[in-house]
Design a protein with these regions (language model features):
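A conserved hydrophobic helix/loop-capping motif in glycosyltransferases and polysaccharide synthases
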Residues: 2-14, 18, 25, 37-39
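Short aromatic/hydrophobic "clamp" motif used to bind/position activated sugar donors
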Residues: 86
Length: 269
């Protein structure tokens, strides 16, 4: 079985589009379950979700926690999941009809994570925009499988993937991080990853690009520095916890990526 985990906080109509895309999967309904984790405020969202999912034939359930945060919600989903494979989907994103089937079919061996194509959709215009993950996938998808180092650029996000539960093990998302929690989680589990399988292009993860901007102020600079230090410390702590089994080049690449990402985000705001 495959478990799809969707964390959501005060959801809008976009959640219905996400759920509709999972109901429309070509994969047989008994082969996957969908777990919605409503985090933060319960009302009126919980009852709205219950009413909406009543029309579906897929196996879907909703759980609620008063503790806000995507990491805590994902961890809660992992703890109650029944599937041998796990997919994370953000509540404002959606997937193609063959998403689950193609991801599942692409796995040739145990210890492999399967990765899908990605399409970034502009929230305002509805147009497809250039996307980092999409460009990396397009440059590599002619390979059936690739090694950890070659796949490192794809492993900055936990979405657009199918991850075996045996690879995840007891690892969970770091609830202290407000940025970079995906990349840290993928780095944590990397010691058990033999390689990455590239799914057929029919497996597409549609990522909604939301509009918005932040002011470039002393406060934002302090926040950026704080986030940077916490991320680097978290990566270093994970790396040192099992230094013999982690790939050194992979982790040092992550340290550099955090630094580079912090500089770019600050300069762009």
């Amino acid at each position: 079985m495959i478990t799809v985990i969707i964390p959501t906080y005060q959801p809008g109509a976009y959640l219905w589009k996400c759920l509709d895309s999972l109901e429309s999967q070509t994969m047989e309904k008994h082969l996957y379950e969908v777990i919605i984790i409503l985090n933060g405020c319960r009302n009126p969202y919980y009852e709205d979700i219950i009413r909406h999912i009543g029309k579906y034939s897929m196996n879907v359930r909703v759980e609620q926690t008063d503790v806000p945060g995507v990491s805590n919600a994902r961890n809660m989903g992992l703890d109650i999941s029944q599937g041998e494979q796990v997919c994370f989907v953000d509540d404002d994103d959606w997937v193609s009809e063959e998403y689950l089937q193609q991801l599942y079919s692409s796995v040739q061996d145990t210890g492999f994570i399967s990765v899908s194509n990605v399409a970034a959709i502009d929230e305002t215009s509805g147009e497809t925009r250039p996307d980092y993950l999409s460009s990396v996938y397009q440059s590599l998808h002619h390979h059936k499988t690739i090694g950890l180092l070659k796949a490192r650029r794809l492993l900055s996000s936990s979405c657009c993937k199918m991850i075996p539960k045996e690879i995840i093990g007891k690892d969970r998302f770091n609830v202290r991080l407000s940025r970079g929690e995906d990349a840290l989680f993928m780095a944590q589990i990397s010691s058990r990853v033999k390689g990455v399988a590239l799914a057929d292009t029919k497996a597409v993860y549609f990522r909604l690009l939301r509009t918005g901007s932040a002011s470039r102020s002393d406060k934002s600079l302090k926040r950026a520095c704080g986030d940077f230090l916490l991320q680097e410390y978290s990566f270093l702590k994970v790396y040192l916890s099992d230094i013999r089994h982690y790939n050194h080049v992979f982790f040092w690449g992550r340290f550099l990526a955090v630094f580079k990402g912090t500089i770019i985000k600050y300069l762009c705001h």
